[in-house]
A protein has these predicted regions:
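Short, small-residue-biased leader/transition segments that mark boundaries at the very start
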Residues: 2-4
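Active-site beta-loop-alpha junctions enriched in small/polar residues
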Residues: 10, 16, 45-47
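Conserved sequence/active-site signature of Rossmann-fold short-chain dehydrogenase/reductase
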Residues: 10, 123-124
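C-terminal segments of enzyme domains that contribute to small-molecule binding surfaces
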Residues: 24-49, 54-71, 75-117, 121-123, ...
C-alpha cells in the first residue's frame, strides 16, 4: 500500500538477457515478478525489469527518482533513496538505508552494503561494504577520491 507510480514508468517488463545459439541471440526467459513493498515512490520514466529466475524487489520506504533503470533480479533494501538516471545492472543487491546520487551506475552481481552513500556520476564495479561513502570511477572511498582529485 501507499506505492506511488509516476507517469511513464514501466514495471515488470522482460529483462535484457540473451544467449547465443547457432549465430542467433535467443532471449533468456524471465519468469520472476517485481515486488514493491509499502510506502515507495517510483519516478517518471523509471523502468524496473522482472526477475529472470528470482524476483526483483524494491524494499519498504524506498524512493526512486525519474529515469532510473533497475534490471532483473535486483534487490533493493528498505529506506533507500536513488536519484535520477541511475542504472543498476542485473542481480545486484542493494542494502538498507542506501543513498545513490544521480547518474551513478552499478555493475551486475554486486553487493552494496547497508548505510552506503554513492556519489553522483560514480561507476561501481566492486562490492561496497557497510557504512561506506564512495565516489568516482571506479568508485573509491570518498576520502581517497577527494585526496586524489
Amino acid at each position: 500500500s501507499d506505492v506511488y507510480k509516476r507517469q511513464g514508468c514501466v514495471i515488470g517488463k522482460h529483462g535484457f538477457g540473451f544467449f547465443p545459439i547457432n549465430n542467433q541471440n535467443l532471449r533468456y526467459p524471465h519468469i520472476g515478478i517485481v515486488i514493491i513493498e509499502d510506502n515507495c515512490e517510483i519516478g517518471c520514466g523509471a523502468t524496473i525489469d522482472r526477475g529472470s529466475m528470482s524476483n526483483t524487489v524494491i524494499g519498504k520506504n524506498t524512493y526512486l527518482d525519474n529515469q532510473i533503470h533497475i534490471a532483473h533480479n535486483v534487490k533493493i533494501g528498505q529506506n533507500s533513496i536513488i536519484a535520477g538516471q541511475v542504472g543498476i545492472a542485473g542481480s545486484s543487491v542493494i542494502g538498507n538505508n542506501v543513498k545513490i546520487g544521480g547518474q551513478a551506475g552499478i555493475s551486475g552481481h554486486l553487493k552494496i552494503g547497508n548505510n552506503v552513500e554513492i556519489g553522483g556520476g560514480s561507476g561501481v564495479i566492486r562490492d561496497i561494504p557497510d557504512n561506506t561513502k564512495v565516489m568516482g570511477y571506479p568508485a573509491k572511498n570518498i576520502r581517497e577520491f577527494l585526496r586524489n582529485n
